């Protein structure tokens, strides 16, 4: 029987262990940031251990970075964590994309941009959304601080092999529907736990037609459907994205020859298989307190089916039967490792251009990396957003999570391009609605959610 992409990647990296039991995997790339690494570095220090492969470790600042002025860090804990990463990287010989560096940004954007993320690798990071890197034909998954220390010391990690799931996606995306809507649809349809215990491969006509940035959006949110890993087979789109980047292989032809073997064999079988027609999708909006609680724009919010729904409606200040258009928005956030890439900002700017943010909205655009910010400014996107009334910020995780000054006030609804809408995720009492960048941009200039498939409803002015 043939092998799936996941089987091939996994088997390449097993150092020790029997089938059915936890196995020791070799780690090709360890990405770190300021929040989950300090304890791990201290553990090495206490045991007088070296960091085994500093050349396979790369650090950046993202979670705690204040995006209004990256050097004006008021929070003492954040300042201490950032300073600790600077000290630790210098002591242990780790390459650091420091504050103000041309490579600084959200860790899951910096890896691909620099060419560190490549097909065939096992990539780990002390962050839930490491599955983003699976878009390149790699295994990427998040780990805890104790596991970060283990990788520091050994360049390996113990893992139980998950089962395999294949999600086949075919059909052309309708106008106004994006990669973000695909993953929100999957989670709303099958639930936040459907991928638990699985490594998911997304494939099919729709995936093949996507850019790498779109593919990363889908893999980024694999964890929100319960899967530890999400991945896609590499192809010419992948190879051309990696080619010429700072850490791309010196012999690209040789690398590509190997990467082309990273495909699921025709006779391979997944443990679970799902088929999806992308051509019938609508823009999605979440109404509740996890990504499963979402609806197509044309649908009303569902009836209460259990205590979780009851609690979600209470927290969000909404009721069954309402529609997304009725939500009284106060904030719009375009950013995060899900949707802060150049193509995301270009699509948002296309909608924003010539319009103004409504008076009831505070709108932020936060490029996910310095590279994206520089590229956006080189083509004038910053001017489009600023003229429309958006705040144009420095790169960082920003309003995706309440660990820096960018937070949504208590009780306020926010249209957000991020990946999680948990209670308090964007600040105490914040009410988060997950959407695509286009939906967020249109909401900012209309003051509420609209059906972006109908261009006539995109208005401007205050």
From Swiss-Prot:
Q: Which SUPFAM superfamilies does the annotation name? A: Aconitase iron-sulfur domain
Binding positions for [4Fe-4S] cluster? 337, 397, 400
Q: Which EC numbers does the record give?
A: 4.2.1.33
Its required cofactor(s), as named, are: [4Fe-4S] cluster
Q: Does the keyword Transmembrane apply?
A: no
Pfam family of this protein, just one?
Answer: Aconitase
Q: In which pathway does it act?
A: Amino-acid biosynthesis; L-leucine biosynthesis; L-leucine from 3-methyl-2-oxobutanoate: step 2/4
The protein's matches in PROSITE patterns, at most eight in alphabetical order, are given as: ACONITASE_1 (PS00450), ACONITASE_2 (PS01244)
Per its record, what are the GO molecular function terms? Answer: 3-isopropylmalate dehydratase activity; 4 iron, 4 sulfur cluster binding; metal ion binding
Show the InterPro entries listed in the entry.
3-IsopropMal_deHydase_lsu (IPR004430), Acnase/IPM_dHydase_lsu_aba_1/3 (IPR015931), Acoase/IPM_deHydtase_lsu_aba (IPR001030), Aconitase_4Fe-4S_BS (IPR018136), Aconitase_4Fe-4S_dom (IPR036008), IPM_dehydratase_rel_enz (IPR050067), IPMI_cat (IPR033941)
Residue ranges annotated as transmembrane are: none
Q: What task does this protein carry out?
A: Catalyzes the isomerization between 2-isopropylmalate and 3-isopropylmalate, via the formation of 2-isopropylmaleate.
Q: What is this protein called?
A: 3-isopropylmalate dehydratase large subunit
Source species:
Listeria monocytogenes serotype 4b (strain CLIP80459)
- What gene does the UniProt entry assign to this protein? leuC
């Amino acid at each position: 029987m043939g092998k799936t992409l996941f089987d091939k990647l996994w088997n390449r990296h097993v150092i020790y262990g029997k089938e059915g039991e936890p196995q020791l995997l070799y780690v090709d790339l360890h990405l770190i940031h300021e929040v989950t690494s300090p304890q791990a570095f201290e553990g090495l220090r206490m045991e007088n251990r070296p960091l085994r492969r500093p050349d396979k470790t790369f650090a950046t600042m993202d979670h705690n970075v204040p995006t209004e002025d990256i050097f004006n860090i008021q929070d003492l804990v954040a300042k201490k964590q950032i300073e600790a990463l600077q000290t630790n990287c210098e002591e242990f010989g780790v390459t650091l994309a420091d504050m103000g560096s041309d490579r600084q940004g959200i860790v899951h954007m910096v890896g691909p941009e620099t060419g560190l993320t490549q097909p065939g690798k096992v990539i780990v990071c002390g962050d839930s959304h490491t599955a983003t890197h699976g878009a390149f034909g790699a295994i990427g998954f998040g780990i805890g601080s104790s596991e970060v220390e283990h990788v520091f010391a050994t360049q390996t990690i113990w893992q139980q092999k998950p089962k395999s799931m294949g999600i086949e996606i075919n059909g052309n995306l309708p106008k106004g529907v994006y990669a973000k809507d695909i993953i929100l649809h999957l989670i709303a349809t099958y639930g936040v736990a459907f991928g638990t215990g699985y490594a998911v491969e997304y494939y099919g006509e729709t995936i093949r037609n996507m850019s790498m940035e779109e593919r990363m959006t889908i893999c980024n949110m694999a964890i929100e459907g319960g899967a530890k890993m999400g991945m896609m087979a590499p192809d010419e789109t992948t190879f051309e994205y990696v080619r010429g980047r700072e850490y791309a292989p010196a012999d690209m032809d040789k690398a590509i020859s190997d990467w082309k073997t990273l495909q699921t064999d025709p006779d391979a079988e997944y443990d679970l298989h799902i088929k999806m027609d992308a051509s019938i999708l609508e823009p999605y909006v979440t109404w509740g307190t996890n990504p499963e609680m979402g609806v197509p724009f044309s649908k009303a919010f569902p009836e209460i089916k259990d205590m979780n729904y009851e609690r979600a409606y209470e927290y969000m200040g909404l009721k069954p039967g309402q529609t997304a258009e009725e939500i009284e928005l106060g904030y719009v956030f375009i950013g995060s490792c899900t949707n802060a890439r150049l193509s995301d900002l270009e699509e948002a700017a296309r909608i924003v251009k010539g319009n103004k943010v409504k008076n009831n909205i505070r709108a932020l655009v936060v490029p996910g990396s310095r590279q994206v910010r520089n590229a956006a400014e080189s083509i004038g996107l910053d001017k489009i957003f600023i003229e429309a009334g958006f705040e144009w910020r420095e790169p960082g995780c920003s309003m995706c999570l309440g660990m820096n000054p960018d937070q949504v006030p208590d009780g306020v609804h926010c249209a957000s391009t991020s990946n999680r809408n948990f209670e308090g995720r964007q600040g105490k009492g914040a009410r988060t609605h997950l959407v695509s960048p286009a939906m967020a941009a249109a909401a900012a200039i209309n003051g509420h959610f609209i059906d972006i498939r109908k261009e006539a409803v995109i208005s401007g002015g205050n």
